């Protein structure tokens, strides 16, 4: 990363170091352009009612020195006293070691400039996530706790499992459902825009939060099912159902990120030149050819050329890639929108978001999951909202990409 830092320092010619707090209303801040090439910088307004020096916006708070043990949180989730997601997460975050994050900034007029790489990560992630949450509120019309509750974001967390340090993780970002936090990992060997500053990656991770809240915390049956399983230390779903739900979650995370950055090849600036950059490109060869049934049969094209792993009928072993099926789901929905970003953003994504609570309710009733459950919920919502063209395209996408599921028993909303 040294060459990258050298470029940063030569680009940001700063005059003074500022270490005090105070209002930054009306100021601007230099961040990484989260959807351009490696060293693209941009100056953006500090969000309203925010303070760039304390890294606080109405939607986001940045944290540092986060340390915790997964086993301790698992025990608390089983034994703790809490009524809902909000109280659980508030108490869980109170059990971990953490500090407010503080960037090193210099000020030129009304412009704040990061003085080191970590500070650039902090202010860039804060800016992008604040914009992402605004997008989910204004465009997607999400009204779950994911957009109502303050998002906590941790830079470089230190995680252990039963006292043993977690295997070193770099070049990544993740959403933790144990703490309702987004983790930003160190940048190491990655060639593209760092995950921690990529608007596509951060939108992907935030959609995981949206999925979690809407599926498990929007309806009483889903809440009861979720917490009953947790209290009794039971798996939420059988292996196959979990694999399919995880793949749905990943596919939607990619699709909502595409909607945010307005680019069906949203991850090309992140995974530069790697297999993932082609496998998760909604305009790429894999997305255009892949199908649910091909993955279920484990055709050699998937296992060898695209490294999708071994999962006969999605009874996966540890080497199976949920991202492969995720791309099939995302591509089917991209085709549903006619590969039109306006239709995707203004029509399809809000309908998908509204349908997520129906998934949780149905899982609570049936105790299992397959992708037909998701598509049936979305088709039913489109029908309720008199979106006939979208409904027809959804059903066509199921027929094209999920042929074995296309029947009146599994996707009845397409037939009645």
What does each of the following model-derived ranges do?
Residues 118, 122-125, 162-416:
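Extracellular protease catalytic domains of secreted zymogens
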Residues 3-4:
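Tryptophan (W) side chains
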Residues 24-191, 212, 216-233, 237:
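Acidic/polar low-complexity interaction segments
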Residues 17-31, 413-416:
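Bacterial Sec-dependent N-terminal signal peptides
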Residues 7-19:
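Bacterial N-terminal signal peptides
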């Amino acid at each position: 990363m040294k060459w990258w830092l050298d470029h940063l320092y030569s680009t940001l010619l700063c005059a003074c170091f500022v270490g005090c707090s105070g209002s930054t209303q009306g100021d601007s801040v230099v961040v990484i352009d989260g959807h351009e090439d490696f060293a693209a910088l941009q100056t953006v307004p500090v969000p309203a009612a925010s303070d760039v020096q304390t890294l606080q916006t109405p939607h986001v708070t940045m944290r540092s020195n986060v340390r915790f043990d997964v086993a301790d949180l698992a025990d608390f989730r089983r034994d703790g006293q809490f009524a809902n997601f909000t109280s659980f997460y508030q108490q869980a975050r109170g059990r971990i070691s953490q500090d407010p994050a503080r960037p090193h900034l210099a000020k030129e007029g009304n412009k704040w400039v990061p003085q080191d790489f970590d500070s650039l990560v902090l202010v860039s992630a804060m800016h992008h996530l604040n914009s992402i949450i605004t997008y989910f509120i204004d465009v997607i019309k999400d009204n779950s706790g994911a957009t109502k509750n303050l998002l906590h974001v941790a830079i470089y967390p230190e995680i252990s499992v039963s006292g043993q340090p977690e295997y070193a993780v770099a070049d990544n970002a993740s959403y933790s459902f144990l703490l309702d936090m987004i983790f930003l990992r160190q940048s190491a060997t990655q060639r593209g825009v760092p995950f921690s500053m990529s608007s596509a990656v951060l939108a992907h991770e935030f959609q995981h939060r949206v999925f979690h809240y809407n599926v498990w915390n929007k309806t009483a049956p889903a809440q009861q099912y979720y917490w009953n399983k947790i209290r009794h230390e039971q798996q939420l779903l059988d292996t196959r159902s979990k694999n399919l739900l995880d793949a749905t979650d990943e596919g939607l995370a990619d699709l909502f990120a595409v909607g945010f950055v307005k680019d069906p090849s949203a991850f090309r600036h992140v995974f530069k030149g790697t297999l993932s950059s082609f496998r998760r490109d909604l305009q790429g060869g894999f997305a255009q050819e892949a199908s649910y049934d091909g993955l279920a049969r484990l055709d050699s094209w998937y296992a060898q050329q695209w490294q999708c792993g071994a999962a006969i009928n999605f009874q996966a072993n540890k080497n199976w890639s949920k991202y492969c099926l995720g791309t099939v789901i995302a591509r089917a929905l991209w085709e549903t929108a006619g590969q039109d970003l306006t239709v995707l953003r203004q029509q399809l994504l809000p309908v998908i978001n509204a349908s997520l609570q129906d998934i949780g309710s149905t899982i609570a009733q049936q105790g299992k999951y397959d992708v037909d459950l998701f598509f049936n919920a979305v088709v039913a919502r489109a029908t309720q909202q008199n979106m006939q063209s979208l409904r027809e395209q959804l059903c066509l996408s199921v027929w094209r990409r999920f042929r074995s599921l296309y029947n009146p028993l599994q996707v009845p909303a397409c037939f009645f």
